[in-house]
């Protein structure tokens, strides 16, 4: 890879020597998967770090979404956002449910609670919001609506690792939250994911479902799948957990630099930190007003690429624009004006712990010039 290339993200890696030492222990034990000691330890350490009661590890970030819907026995219609990675909606479809899109709040990029009630029908059983870019949803407003109509709430928290509101982990909201530990995330286990739940009964059910439905050596209690995390990635995750706070702080410093440099650039806007929130700086999206900036989003995107700077248009196109979902009534662009506006103007700038001062300045100069 070109050494001068500035990538949009870069994986947080544990020391190779430290990881090799743990691998040797795993080799000696000959226990490489199926709820081994590293798996148990990582679940325990993550629950403490995230300030949640229970964590169940998965082999990637999509399977927790699929399994959460199964665990809560969701049927019918699920209200969700079109402004996310497509796995959010795929999980609904794979469970035989119908996704119903509602528009977003332009101040956050998250599902607009004011749009939810109008989308509820007698077939609605759940709401699946996303903490977009790690910015917390209005969890109280969403929960009030869910309680009023007897709906379950499953948060796709793929971007929200370690995010807190007034000192409380955001993953305590709703009935279940799911996480992605993909290599591109703030915290990664190479590939991986997790589910957060609030009681031991649900934890047991989910652990059964991710292990083919086995509740014992000879008893299957439901149609489960195999989505367990192995010992190697669990060990990797334990090591990465020790350095994730430093990585988040490094990201914070990048965000400070971007904001200071870009705040006065006409036609470029971005999100500021929310009061009382411990952010994780998963992404740094900017929004391009072509008329004011003098260049379209796609022109700036191409300019960055020509200079060896890889941004990403997260999330363009909207999920509702993919052929699989375009025919849904709720996918009508007239129903989703704010989501379309954001999708058509966004570029996520390079954001990771490994960016040098020179890298950051190159990104800034490309936008300011």
Tell where the protein language model's regions lie, with residue ranges.
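PLP-dependent aminotransferase class I/II
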Residues: 37-45, 49-53, 114, 118, ...
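Conserved active-site segment immediately N-terminal to the catalytic lysine
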Residues: 155-189, 204, 216-221
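Short beta-strand-to-turn element immediately C-terminal to the catalytic PLP-Schiff-base lysine
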Residues: 180, 193-199, 238
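Structural detector of well-ordered beta-strand residues that form the stable sheet scaffold
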Residues: 56, 79, 100, 153-154, ...
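PLP-dependent aminotransferase-like
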Residues: 1, 70-157, 164
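Histidine-centered beta-alpha loop that forms part of the nucleotide-sugar donor binding/catalytic region
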Residues: 83, 97, 104, 158-159, ...
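N-terminal "arm"/small-domain region of PLP-dependent enzymes with the aminotransferase-like
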Residues: 1-32, 350
């Amino acid at each position: 890879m070109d050494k001068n290339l500035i990538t949009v993200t870069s994986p947080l890696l544990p020391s190779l020597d430290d990881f090799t030492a743990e691998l040797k222990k795993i080799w000696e034990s000959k226990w490489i998967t199926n709820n081994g000691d590293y798996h148990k330890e990582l679940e325990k350490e993550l629950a403490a770090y995230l300030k949640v009661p229970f964590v169940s590890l998965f082999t990637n970030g999509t399977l927790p979404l699929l399994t959460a819907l199964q665990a809560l026995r969701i049927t019918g219609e699920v209200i969700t956002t079109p402004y996310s990675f497509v796995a959010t909606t795929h999980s609904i479809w794979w469970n035989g449910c119908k996704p119903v899109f509602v528009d977003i709040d332009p101040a956050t990029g998250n599902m607009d609670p004011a749009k939810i009630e109008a989308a509820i029908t007698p077939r609605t059983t759940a709401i699946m919001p996303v903490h977009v870019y790690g910015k917390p949803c209005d969890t109280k407003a969403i929960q009030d609506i869910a309680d009023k109509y007897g709906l379950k709430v499953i948060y796709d928290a793929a971007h929200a690792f370690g995010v807190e509101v007034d000192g409380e982990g955001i993953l305590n909201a709703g009935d279940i939250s799911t996480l992605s530990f993909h290599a591109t995330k703030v915290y990664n286990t190479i590939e991986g994911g997790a589910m957060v739940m609030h009681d031991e009964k649900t934890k047991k059910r989910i652990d059964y479902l991710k292990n083919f439905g086995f509740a014992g050596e000879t008893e299957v209690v439901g149609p489960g799948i195999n989505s367990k995390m192995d010992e190697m990635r669990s060990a990797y995750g334990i090591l990465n957990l020790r350095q994730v706070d430093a990585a988040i702080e490094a990201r914070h410093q990048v965000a400070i630099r971007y904001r200071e440099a870009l705040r006065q650039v006409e036609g470029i806007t971005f999100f500021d930190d929310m009061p009382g929130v411990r952010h994780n700086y998963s992404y740094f999206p900017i929004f391009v007003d072509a008329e004011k900036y003098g260049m379209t989003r796609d022109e700036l995107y191409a300019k960055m690429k020509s200079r060896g700077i890889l941004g990403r248009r997260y999330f363009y196109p909207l999920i509702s624009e993919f052929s699989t979902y375009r025919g849904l009534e709720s996918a009508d662009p007239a129903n989703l004006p704010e989501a379309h506006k954001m999708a058509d103007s966004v570029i996520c700038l390079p954001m990771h712990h490994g960016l040098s001062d020179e890298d950051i300045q190159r990104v800034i100069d490309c936008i300011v010039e």
